[in-house]
Amino acid sequence: MTTKIKSEEISSIIKERIENFNINIDISETGKVIAYADGVAKVYGLNNVMYYEMVEFDTGDTGIAFNLEESSVGVVVLGSGRTIKEGTSVKRLKKLMKVPVGDAIVGRVINTLGEPIDGKGAIEANEYRFVEEKAPGIMARKSVHQPLQTGLKAIDALVPIGRGQRELIIGDRQTGKTTVAIDTIINQKGQDVICIYVAVGQKESTVAQVVRKLEEHGAMDYTVVVNAPASFSAAMQFLAPYTGVTIGEYFRDNARHALIIYDDLSKHAVAYREMSLILRRPPGREAFPGDVFYLHSRLLERAAKLNDELGAGSLTALPIIETQAGDVAAYIPTNVISITDGQIFLETDLFNSGIRPAINVGLSVSRVGGAAQIKATKQVAGTLRLDLAQYRELQAFSQFASDLDESSRKQLERGQRMVEILKQPPYSPLSIEKQVIIIYAGANGYLDNIPANKVIKFESELYPFLEAKYPKIFEDISVKKAIDKETEAELSKALEEFKINFGA
């Protein structure tokens, strides 16, 4: 027996079907690789792709649209790109590059893309940020006024660094640039400062050594390492500092403090030059492209001290530049010197003569850090730069003149002891209270009778003596941030007592 379907039922079924009709069409704009070499693909067919947009190859590799030409697009490949060849399909992702940020990545070693490379499992990040962001404007900033202590006497006394400052570390290879940066990270322990170390174009073994050193001193607990070694493509090396600064900005914008080290921007500029030349952009001075200044200025301008309305967070940058035979007048060094708020100049001759950290006090400056220096340091190190300059002058003169008058001889001897005081072994940063005490002792003649070669021994024995018998001195300097008459009297008494007992 056949059942008849009423016409109303048919129409209601058709209506229902039409209402629930859903078709999933995935529209993606694709193109084809027409040429590929040295980590750069020339792609045809991505007519609507935007500058800096992410694209995906059907091999699984990702890239960034870097050159937008009339008939093709120049794409820099992130990753090895070994399987990309002519004819490989490429599709637009319609998004810009983002990296994970937040506390989840603190203590980790990551690559340029924010992927973990330390074998400690996946990163569970709650927030992702664009790697290219605008730097804070003038009104969003506040002048630098809080100190960021490095733990190095020569820097904290003579070229002080403030939170939110950009201070360049510049010098030839093997002069201790990375050591200064690592010391600064170690000294941030307990200071509530998150540190980011960006390694660009370094050897994997060198970065592993840095990570091991940070772990030894318990500094990895508040540090992120972004690694783009020499084996990575030029694009990965070029983007690494931007990944690092994006991570730092998260803390800066959340009313916290961060420190970022770029090791080093010379290799960063070389990676950018390599990329630009492969993309056939016109070369300029030293074959660098015309926008190499903008490359570094937009990166370093993102370090800032924010105003109180925005939370008063800060991001301090310590870029490193490697010079060739002390040539600070080369293209990249002069560019970065003009962008930063001062520079710490390390010299090969000083390093080889045993003065370490090998800081050339005459050429090193801090343009804004003076406002951040605590009063106690200002009191003891006020004339130190001038005294050292006069000592260097006298030293040069005394090589030719044998008969020096009494005051010149005393000045020469005092200078020798001050140079000894500023020496410091690597990876042993000092608290600001200890720095103030030893510089006070040197500047006020307490070391004049101590042989120059015994100054380091004097210093190493002085701190335990004061901690045991005069702990209040450390406390007073720490709390008051200055040396008042009472503290000075106590310190003088302690130094006199120690000198009598010191077995030189």
From Swiss-Prot:
Site (Required for activity): S364
Membrane topology of the entry: Peripheral membrane protein
InterPro entries noted in UniProt: ATP_synth_asu-like_sf, ATP_synth_asu_C, ATP_synth_asu_C_sf, ATP_synth_F1_a_nt-bd_dom, ATP_synth_F1_asu, ATPase_a/bsu_AS, ATPase_F1/V1/A1_a/bsu_N, ATPase_F1/V1/A1_a/bsu_N_sf
Reaction equation(s) it catalyzes: ATP + H2O + 4 H(+)(in) = ADP + phosphate + 5 H(+)(out)
Highest taxon in the source lineage: Bacteria
GO cellular component, one term: proton-transporting ATP synthase complex
NCBIfam families, per the entry: atpA (TIGR00962), PRK13343.1 (NF009884)
Family: Belongs to the ATPase alpha/beta chains family.
Annotated function: Produces ATP from ADP in the presence of a proton gradient across the membrane. The alpha chain is a regulatory subunit.
Subunit note: F-type ATPases have 2 components, CF(1) - the catalytic core - and CF(0) - the membrane proton channel. CF(1) has five subunits: alpha(3), beta(3), gamma(1), delta(1), epsilon(1). CF(0) has three main subunits: a(1), b(2) and c(9-12). The alpha and beta chains form an alternating ring which encloses part of the gamma chain. CF(1) is attached to CF(0) by a central stalk formed by the gamma and epsilon chains, while a peripheral stalk is formed by the delta and b chains.
Record HAMAP family: ATP_synth_alpha_bact
The protein, known as: ATP synthase subunit alpha
Species of provenance: Helicobacter hepaticus (strain ATCC 51449 / 3B1)
Gene label: atpA
